[in-house]
Amino acid sequence: MIAMNTPDFQRMKKDNKKISMVTCYDYWSACIISQSNVDCILVGDSLAMVMYGHSTTLPATVEIMAQHIQAVSRGAPNKFIIGDMPFCSYRKDLTTSMNAVERLMQAGAQAIKLEGADAHNLKFIHHVVKSGIPVIGHLGLTPQSIYTLGGFKVQGKEPSAAKKLMADAKALAETGCFAVVLECVPSELAELITNSISIPTIGIGAGPATSGQVLVLQDLLGTNNQFQPKYLKKFLNGFELIKKALDDFDQEVKTSTYPHLETHCY
């Protein structure tokens, strides 16, 4: 049984209880998260970068997302799972875009997430919500628009940009989103937005005042020693621990210490 549902997001904001979300892409990681206290899982299109080595999220496709959502849902059937709508999948005609939503939901997502709040997106979100499908918005640094934004950089610094982010957040809430991700926006702006809309905000690089926080599993475990944005706290030195385990394995194989005849052999 799933431990969390969409009304719980609203309740947790009302009760001032923080929401924890982890981005996860695979079965074995999801199995670990399923045994943790983390509230919910995002299967993000960032898998194009983290799992496949691309420089942007753009190569993620609906089918790739569906395969990873299936894997995560098998590993964490007790967690609320959000599936990212990948690049351009919701910028097509309504039938094609809804087919993409259907694919992700049938793969095991309980909600979808999409980036931006222009007129096209708001109309599409309205249709999806009216179809009974929960939607999370995403504002600030929206990686699918990376070439328009000019890189992975903080958004909303200028007054006009901050005003637009506030208006977009209100529009997403009014259109029916049950939460919104705020990525790489100034802390004060994120706090203002959080206090100005009824739905929860989930921050990543948006300060401590948001309704919750999301980090990519591999990032919080410290598995990439080359990746250290300002917002990231590594809760484990995963790179060094995993590397040491591999080196220990290598040494024991080469010294015939492993496998031990009495302990590891049949």
Curated annotation (Swiss-Prot):
Enzyme class per UniProt: transferase
Cysteine pairings via disulfide bonds: none
Protein residues bound to Mg(2+): 45, 84, 115
Pfam families reported in the protein's UniProt record: Pantoate_transf
SUPFAM superfamilies attached to this UniProt entry: Phosphoenolpyruvate/pyruvate domain
Pathway where it operates: Cofactor biosynthesis; (R)-pantothenate biosynthesis; (R)-pantoate from 3-methyl-2-oxobutanoate: step 1/2
Catalytic function, reaction form: 3-methyl-2-oxobutanoate + (6R)-5,10-methylene-5,6,7,8-tetrahydrofolate + H2O = 2-dehydropantoate + (6S)-5,6,7,8-tetrahydrofolate
GO function terms (MF aspect): 3-methyl-2-oxobutanoate hydroxymethyltransferase activity; magnesium ion binding
Broad class of the protein's primary localization: cytoplasm
Binding-site list for 3-methyl-2-oxobutanoate: 45-46, 84, 113
Residues annotated as catalytic: 183
Keywords: Cytoplasm, Magnesium, Metal-binding, Pantothenate biosynthesis, Transferase
GO biological process, one term: pantothenate biosynthetic process
InterPro entries documented for this protein: Pantoate_hydroxy_MeTrfase, Pyrv/PenolPyrv_kinase-like_dom, Pyrv_kinase-like_dom_sf
Free-text comment on the cofactor: Binds 1 Mg(2+) ion per subunit.
Highest taxon in the source lineage: Bacteria
Gene Ontology CC terms, in alphabetical order: cytoplasm
Coiled coil regions in record: none
Listed EC numbers: 2.1.2.11
Subcellular location: Cytoplasm
Subunit structure, interactors included: Homodecamer; pentamer of dimers.
The family this protein is said to belong to: Belongs to the PanB family.
Record's function text: Catalyzes the reversible reaction in which hydroxymethyl group from 5,10-methylenetetrahydrofolate is transferred onto alpha-ketoisovalerate to form ketopantoate.
Identification of the protein by name: 3-methyl-2-oxobutanoate hydroxymethyltransferase
Species in which this protein is naturally found: Coxiella burnetii (strain CbuK_Q154) (Coxiella burnetii (strain Q154))
Lineage: Bacteria, Pseudomonadati, Pseudomonadota, Gammaproteobacteria, Legionellales
Gene field: panB
